[in-house]
Amino acid sequence: EITTRLVGSEMCIRDRYGFTTGSCAAAAAKAAAYMLLTGKIKNCITIETPKGIPYTAEVTDIVRGESQVSCAVVKDGGDDPDVTSGSKICATVTADNRGDGEKELLQIDGGKGVGRVTRPGLDQPVGNAAINHVPREMITREVQEVCRICDFHGTLHILISVPDGEALAERTFNPRLGIVGGISILGTTGIVEPMSSQALKETIRVELRQQRAEGQTIAAVSPGNYGLDFMQQTYGYDLDRSVKCSNFIGETIDMAAELGFCAMLLTGHIGKLIKVAGGIMNTHSHEGDCRMELLAAAGIRENVSLECLKKILDCVTTEEALAFIDAEGKKEDIMEDIMEKIDFYLKKRAAGRLQIECIVYSNTYGLLGMTAKAEELLRRLL
């Protein structure tokens, strides 16, 4: 799907969308459940993505048994292919008549080629298949729809697998994150939006210009969906008045200043914004990753024990590192140090052209820190 959006007098063109591994898993699971419960072949299937964009997928590799059906959907990365593009995302659905007779029971797990979580701090607990919560919700919703249509009230076991997942995982961050044996089934919106740097930056500029044209003088900016969700859920902020800047924090500051905003409020997860404390203004992992080193440096300044510092440096996620810091009773001290560094580098980039403030949060601990005048700026936004 190619999308075109008119903003003011400018046309913002995005290339062809792709669909996430989560969407593929949900489509394959829905198709397998449908074929199992109806006895009919299904060569294509449509699901609704969280983004609201329908996804119609071709169903391949169909194998039917008396109480089990498996099939596959080929991952289409659109115009932003990644290592999983072209891979088969498979689902095997097995029926079990046990249940309460009133409501179906769905059990979701990962099979061959789907990673298994071995370290804390990720979307799923240790021991679970690396099928993130949004794909699990998508699979559940789509299969429940089939159960309702077919008036099925038993148990369905849903196994997601990726035949080449183990090999693909070696080309991802999964081994370092402590996800072993395969890839992760991911996606928060269900779609893959084209990620060419120039296209993204043009989109950011157009959206900022639109906000400015509508009279906004303070730019509310977040690197991604999670930051925007935090703003909405914590402060009730209208997402339509927010701009997603991806990894381009420095350039977004420049754009906001050029377009005449008097201030900008940046809200994001510690895992992304910790990099700003080191003066990194493009937070993509390809540009550099010193998250644990920055946390450890703050720990040294705040007299954290050597044992804790070693644990921080061995962590793969900031959530995991925060748990060690919190256990030492140093979370507030370290976050105060980190926020001072973030404040310094943001103001250095802004160079007096606009006021800039920042809010940092964690999935586990919620609000972690604010720069000195962030709360005041937030009140003006609300």
Annotated model-derived regions:
Residues 1-8, 13:
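Single conserved hydrophobic/aromatic residue that forms the stacking wall/gate
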Residues 16-53, 60-75, 79-85, 91-262, ...:
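N-terminal loops that bind phosphate or other acidic moieties
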